[in-house]
């Protein structure tokens, strides 16, 4: 179910939340924030009008590495909604070799069921923990049989006072971790999953075969000798699975998939027809993919193993760099289904400085935390941040512009020696300044051939 704390967030609040993770691109954030708020608005309408209001799908246009995918992913996380990301190039027209576009909705349904199953397990976790404790205590303290007609369930409900006192004592020790290293023998459910390789375009058949073999092996268990520390999470997971009503999970998940699902289609420009003259034979398949996508975006029924999913109210966000093609190269019917168009700007040096320092999980904070696990106190001076941003911008300008992803490459190269030597430098403090950056990267930046292959 959508997070009640975020379901009523205003567009301004949604943008502010996205700002904590993504730098710049205000227009794109506004567009997705309005789209998310419109879902809440639609749910407040009378049912007959609610079904007539269709989502306004979004087309994001911008170079790689500027935040298109991250905006969509953060939006789905914020809304606690089923989300799936696909590349348009992985799909081909029905009849060609490749994946069927309806697999997108099947993947979304899988994601939704998994999300709702995990949420259901969280709700019953306390009860599952108690049941797991009882099973561990039963293994530690076998109940005494009482001859013919002995009922173990009745014995569990009405234990003797001596048994009760012992179990209370052992339960306390169990919760305090005093019994973690003790070994016990348990009947643990067997996971009957089987990995089946299928040729392109037959993924649905592979899923059905996996499900069939899983059902054949369900209910089986095997005796295993484990430490209590290792057995406890297995038992909690098993007991939580027993407490969850799978039918309720599937019903709620399919409804969430239909009403709140978000599909992000990347590289949509790669299936656009590029120009009139000199077009390749691949254009036939490209247009076929667009025509196959059209029913999903317009609204259709897709059969999944959980039931039929209606795509009428699923939000589709498509993105592409559109270097060689233009949005107008998409077939007119598909263009009309993406009424909101947002252009994301290329990142500048100033943007890189902000990306390195401002987000909640900024890159510099990540590297500082990683090396702190080795006892190395790493800090970045402001002039180092400025120099790193300048180098990333220069390399992007000279080579292929890969946006913020260039920062990962530059930082990995910068900290290569330190990451290797970190275990031997426990307790040391290291400050990275502009001089250190130039010492590590200066030669690479100045030599265009080296920077092409290393940065």
Swiss-Prot record:
Gene3D superfamilies given for it? Answer: 1.10.8.60, P-loop containing nucleotide triphosphate hydrolases (3.40.50.300)
Q: Which CDD domains does the entry link to?
A: RecA-like_HslU
GO cellular component labels: HslUV protease complex
Keywords, A to Z, come to: ATP-binding, Chaperone, Cytoplasm, Nucleotide-binding
User: Coiled-coil region(s) at which residues?
Assistant: none
User: GO terms for molecular function, please?
Assistant: ATP binding; ATP hydrolysis activity; peptidase activity; proteasome-activating activity
Q: Name one GO biological process term.
A: protein unfolding
Tell me yes or no: is Repeat among this UniProt entry's keywords.
no
Q: Does the keyword Nucleotide-binding apply?
A: yes
Q: Which InterPro entries match?
A: AAA+_ATPase (IPR003593), ATP-dep_Clp_protease_ClpX (IPR050052), ATPase_AAA_core (IPR003959), Clp_ATPase_C (IPR019489), HslU (IPR004491), P-loop_NTPase (IPR027417)
Which annotated residues bind ATP? 23, 65-70, 266, 333, 405
Q: This protein's superkingdom? A: Bacteria
Q: Where in the cell is it found?
A: Cytoplasm
The family database entries (PANTHER family) matched by this protein are listed as: ATP-DEPENDENT CLP PROTEASE ATP-BINDING SUBUNIT CLPX-LIKE, MITOCHONDRIAL-RELATED, ATP-DEPENDENT PROTEASE ATPASE SUBUNIT HSLU
Quaternary context? A double ring-shaped homohexamer of HslV is capped on each side by a ring-shaped HslU homohexamer. The assembly of the HslU/HslV complex is dependent on binding of ATP.
Recorded family membership: Belongs to the ClpX chaperone family. HslU subfamily.
NCBIfam families per UniProt = hslU (TIGR00390), PRK05201.1 (NF003544)
The UniProt function text for this chain reads: ATPase subunit of a proteasome-like degradation complex; this subunit has chaperone activity. The binding of ATP and its subsequent hydrolysis by HslU are essential for unfolding of protein substrates subsequently hydrolyzed by HslV. HslU recognizes the N-terminal part of its protein substrates and unfolds these before they are guided to HslV for hydrolysis.
Q: What is this protein called?
A: ATP-dependent protease ATPase subunit HslU
């Amino acid at each position: 179910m959508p997070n009640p704390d975020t379901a009523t967030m205003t567009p301004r609040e949604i943008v502010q939340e996205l700002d904590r993770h993504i730098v710049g691109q205000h227009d794109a954030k506004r567009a997705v924030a309005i789209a998310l708020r419109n879902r809440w608005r639609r749910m407040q309408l009378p049912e007959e009008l609610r079904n007539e209001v269709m989502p306004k799908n979004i087309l994001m246009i911008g170079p790689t590495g500027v935040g298109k995918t991250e905006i969509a992913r953060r939006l789905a996380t914020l809304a606690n909604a089923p989300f799936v990301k696909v590349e348009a190039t992985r799909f081909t027209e029905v009849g060609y070799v490749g994946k069927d576009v309806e697999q997108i909705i099947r993947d979304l349904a899988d994601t939704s069921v998994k999300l709702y199953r995990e949420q259901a397990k969280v709700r019953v976790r306390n009860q599952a923990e108690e049941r797991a404790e009882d099973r561990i205590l039963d293994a530690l303290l076998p109940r005494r049989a009482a001859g013919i007609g002995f009922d173990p369930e009745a014995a569990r409900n009405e234990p003797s006072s001596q048994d009760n006192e012992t179990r209370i004592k052992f339960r306390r020790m169990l919760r305090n971790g005093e019994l973690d290293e003790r070994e016990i023998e348990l009947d643990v459910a067997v996971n009957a999953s089987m990995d089946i390789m299928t040729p392109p375009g037959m993924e649905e058949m592979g899923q059905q075969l996996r499900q069939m073999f899983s059902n054949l092996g369900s209910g089986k268990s095997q005796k295993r000798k484990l430490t209590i520390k290792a057995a406890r999470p297995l038992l909690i997971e098993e007991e939580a699975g027993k407490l969850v009503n799978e039918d309720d999970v599937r019903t709620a998940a399919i409804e969430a998939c239909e009403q709140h699902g978000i599909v992000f289609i990347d590289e949509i420009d790669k299936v656009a027809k590029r120009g009139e003259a000199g077009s390749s034979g691949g254009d036939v398949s490209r247009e076929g993919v667009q025509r196959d996508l059209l029913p999903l975006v317009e609204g259709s029924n897709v059969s999944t193993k959980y039931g039929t999913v209606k795509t009428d109210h699923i939000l589709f966000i498509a993105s592409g760099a559109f270097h060689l093609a233009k949005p107008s190269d998409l077939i007119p019917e598909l263009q009309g289904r993406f009424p909101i168009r947002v252009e994301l700007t290329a990142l500048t040096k100033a943007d890189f400085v902000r990306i390195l320092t401002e987000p909640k999980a900024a890159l510099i904070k990540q590297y500082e935390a990683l090396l702190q696990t080795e006892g190395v106190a790493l800090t970045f001076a402001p002039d180092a941040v400025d120099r790193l941003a300048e180098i990333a911008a220069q390399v992007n300008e000279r080579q292929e512009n890969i946006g913020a992803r260039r920062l990962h490459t530059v930082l990995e190269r910068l900290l290569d020696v330190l990451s290797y030597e970190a275990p031997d430098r426990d307790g040391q403090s290291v400050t990275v300044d502009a001089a250190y950056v130039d010492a590590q990267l200066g030669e690479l930046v100045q030599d265009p051939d080296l920077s092409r292959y290393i940065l």
